[in-house]
Structures are given as structure tokens and as C-alpha cells.
């Protein structure tokens, strides 16, 4: 509803303000990346399956290294990406979450067979307040701030986000973070 949408916008603006002024507090600790991604999957799955009739799959490699960071913020970023996949995939679509590691990094990929993003819009996705399709975003509650916030949070964790998409076919989002050094 409109009250929830306005609350979400205010929360996003407060988060951006904290980022801009270096006031965003991070609760840094060692945590299981695999467990964090599993938490996001479990939290999103019910909505995806019951409200949108999506097939939602989760694959997780064995022995993914831990991460040093703010678990809540990382889960917030991944939930934003998964929520976008749910919102912009027509009912009955498929969303996959894949967590793994490569070298000294961990990653999560979120892929969907949704509506995709036009190629001309890809370079602007991380701009504040940029929305690919304003009517579509307004209908689904988009503010144009989520991806900007996600990139800022990941940057503070020395991580990155990459988005590939084909309009009409779907989107592939990859988040990469440095793995924590092995415990002694």
C-alpha cells in the first residue's frame, strides 16, 4: 500500500544520507555466507511461490568460506536483488539463487526469466532514482534507490555487483565479496 511505499522511500533516503556522510554503522563480524544466502532464500521463497507462483531454486556449493562484514547489510543487498527478480518476473516464472566461491572470493548469482532490462538502461542502473520503466516501477513499488544502495554497501565491503540482462528473456545479477581469511 501507499503508506508502506512511503516508509520504504524514507528508509532508503535515510540509508543513502548515512552513506553520504560516512555515518552508516557497520556491525562487522565473521559469518557464514552460505547461511546468510540460505536465510534470504527462505525468507523470499514463500512470497515467490504463493503470491507469484514462481519456481524458486537454491543451489549452494559445499565449503563456501566465511565473510567478514555486516551480515544484516549483506542480507539486505541480496534480498533487494531477489525481491527485484520476484517483482519483475511474470507469474509462473523461474528464479534461481546460486551461492559459491572462486579463489579468494565468495559470490551469489540471482537469475530469472523475467522481463529483462533494455540494453540502453544497463549503464544507468546504479544511478540514484533511476528507474528503467517509471510506470512499471511505480506499479511494483520501485524507488530507483535499491541498486544504488546495494552497490554502496558492497563497495564498503570491498565487493561488487554486476548485472547482465536481455530484454524479454531475463536478468543475471552477480554479487562478489572477499572471503574471510581462514581461521587460525
Spans of features found by a protein language model:
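Conserved catalytic submotifs in the C-terminal HATPase_c
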Residues: 27-32, 55-65
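Conserved glycine-rich
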Residues: 158-159
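Short helix N-cap motif at coil->helix boundaries in the Bergerat
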Residues: 33, 116-127
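Conserved micro-motifs of the catalytic ATP-binding
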Residues: 21-26, 66-69
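Short helix-loop "hinge" at the ATP-lid/N-box region of the Bergerat-fold HATPase_c
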Residues: 85-86
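Short beta-strand/loop element within the Bergerat-fold HATPase_c
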Residues: 92-104
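Short alpha-helical segment of the dimerization/phosphotransfer core of two-component systems
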Residues: 1-6
